[in-house]
Amino acid sequence: MVNVLFQYTHLTKADPQLIVYIEYKKRGDFIMRIALINENSQAAKNEMIYASLKKVAESKGHTVDNYGMYSADDKAQLTYVQNGILAAILLNSGAADFVVTGCGTGEGAMLALNSFPGVLCGHVVDPSDAYMFMQINDGNAIALPFAKGFGWGAELNLTYIFEKLFEGEPGGGYPKERVVPEQRNKKILDGVR
């Protein structure tokens, strides 16, 4: 398979004007290093979340690093605020291009991550949230609710969310007739942050 290298401005660094080189496969998928970070209230679900994320991400050529918590019994009991700090360090250092995290509702994790420079985190509940967040907002992190509404079929919903999250090139705009205004709005947001 022929790989093409080109320049792509993306929010994976503290300076959004920094040009980051991302390898694109011929079929158009871009390659990311994805970090999974779980906090203490939902740590017991880490293995299931990781398996679902890894299955989808690797099928698209991405890699996934699991930063834990790995179980509810881990000695290090991470809060979503600590996860926000870790996410900011990973994203701003270039150790990760994207972060998947969450908490009981996903709200606290989203707020914590968005408290740090260089992080643009969306709250994602379903596959359409995932798709529109990546197409419209082109962020570098998502926070999921791992307790609220997380019952029967939760692993299926996770798989569908990850499939839509990593579908195609981010920042393409949605709906298609709104691509130009959406991309303009994103640049304004980047300038404010």
Q: What is each model feature region?
A:
Residues 10-31:
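Short, Lys/Arg-enriched N-terminal segments with co-localized hydrophobic residues
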Residues 33-53:
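N-terminal beta1-alpha1 ligand-phosphate binding loop
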Residues 42-44, 131-193:
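C-terminal binding/interaction regions
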Residues 61-75:
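A short beta-strand-loop structural module common to alpha/beta enzyme folds
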Residues 80-98:
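Short, structured active-site "lid" loops
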Residues 96-102, 121:
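A short, small-residue-rich loop immediately preceding and capping a beta-strand
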Residues 108-121, 125-126:
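Short Gly/Thr/Asp-enriched flexible loops that form oxyanion-binding sites at enzyme active sites
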